[in-house]
Amino acid sequence: MLTREQAHELLDLCFDINGDEKRKRSKTGELPTTFFRFSGHVNNIEIDVHEKGWDRDIYPEKCFAIWLAETYGDTYEGVKDYLFQLKKMTAELALETVKQHDIDYMSMSVLYHRKEVLSNDIFKQ
């Protein structure tokens, strides 16, 4: 089962991972891409994750399904923990991308606009 607040939290984590720009391999390399879908007719949420970036004809590495009023499917805690870890890895990968391609700090926000996700230690490197 999933509350509305928990659904919003999962959506926020997907935005933290994706940013709000288009995300596909040709633009952002291997930064993860998330897909978040709510199906009102069955009252469930599905989250697909392309861990190495989205590209045509490539299936997601992870697919989650959570029902708002049922007890089957994936658990909120399990999906949240996975997305939180992916969010941290995305922050580190975005910084590595910036370092490898000698992109200035302002350009980094295009790759990953949620800089508050990155810890101060990562920015000091």
Give the positions of each predicted feature:
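An extracellular/secretory-lumen and virion-surface interaction module
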Residues: H50
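Negatively charged, low-complexity tracts enriched in Asp/Glu with abundant Ser/Thr
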Residues: M1-N44, G53-Q125
